[in-house]
Design a protein with these regions (language model features):
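Catalytic cores of RNA-modifying enzymes
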Residues: 1-203, 207, 245-246, 256-257
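C-terminal lobe and adjacent flexible extensions of AdoMet/dcAdoMet transferase-like proteins
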Residues: 188, 207-257
Length: 257
């Protein structure tokens, strides 16, 4: 058993009873590529293997820690379904391409949850579905709805329906983190955007939520709000992702959306 590296945010699960429902929630089908983020000791990888063995499914297990990558290479060297990738997930995701449906899952390091979520949305092939174990407070924020929306919930829910599946107590991890976790499921909506437009939309939402407790006449001009048919007395958390997207389209005439 390798010692966890604190700088990599490593906290490991050991019970199949927790990770098996994550794999089941992904709804794996033939002809799909599965990306596993941070396999560590391989507990999730092993369950994935049992679910996909003998099927037309490819699993990419992406691990940044050389120790675990070597261990997994040894475990799955003769298994054609599993490809172990020794890479930083934030550098690898933008390079991944596929002509098949893509799904993603993993127990994410809490300290890079937001960058990973953003990277998933900006992938060349946006995943059909994602199942992640993340910090409970962040999970609740990602799944929040108007009038309690946030920047991250609005951004993610423009492209995905977000559902909190179940909580995972911190005592289920080794070493135990300071906070509890929760598993979320993201299911693709019909919204289509290229990466460049997504980044512009991301900047637009950052502007909108730069003063979350202020009314919308703070980040936007009277003319902009009037053009979008937006009540200037509302606050950013009052609008749904659909309303934000329509407002963005009006202001940017985004024909590519």
């Amino acid at each position: 058993m390798y010692e966890p590296v604190k700088s990599l945010g490593q906290n490991f699960l050991s019970k199949p009873s927790i990770v098996a429902p994550m794999v089941d929630a992904l709804g794996i089908a033939n002809g799909e590529d599965i990306i596993e983020i941070g396999p560590g000791h391989g507990i999730l990888t092993e369950i994935l293997l049992h679910r996909v063995s003998g099927r037309d499914v490819k699993v990419y297990s992406v691990e940044v820690d050389e120790r675990f990558a070597k261990k997994l290479f040894g475990m799955y060297a003769s298994e054609p379904t599993i490809e172990v990738v020794h890479e930083d997930i934030l550098k690898w995701l933008p390079t991944f391409t596929s002509d098949r449906k893509v799904k993603v899952l993993g127990s994410l390091p809490y300290y890079i949850t937001s960058p990973i979520l953003h990277s998933v949305v900006k992938m060349e092939v946006m995943p059909e579905c994602a199942v992640f174990l993340i910090q409970k407070e962040v999970a609740e924020k990602v799944c929040s709805k108007a009038p309690d929306a946030s920047y991250i919930s609005t951004f993610i829910q423009t492209f995905y329906d977000a559902e909190l599946l179940f909580n995972v107590p911190k005592t289920e991890f080794t070493p135990a983190p300071k906070v509890d976790g929760a598993v979320i499921k993201l299911t693709r909506t019909t919204v289509e955007m290229d990466r460049g437009t997504i980044e512009k939309y991301e900047g637009f939402l950052h502007r909108a939520f730069s003063h979350p407790r202020k009314m919308l006449n703070k980040p936007f001009s009277k003319e902009e709000l009037s053009k979008g048919g937006i009540d200037p007395k509302l606050r950013p958390q009052n609008l749904s992702p659909e309303e934000w997207l329509e407002f963005y389209k009006v202001l940017h005439s985004a024909a590519s959306i």
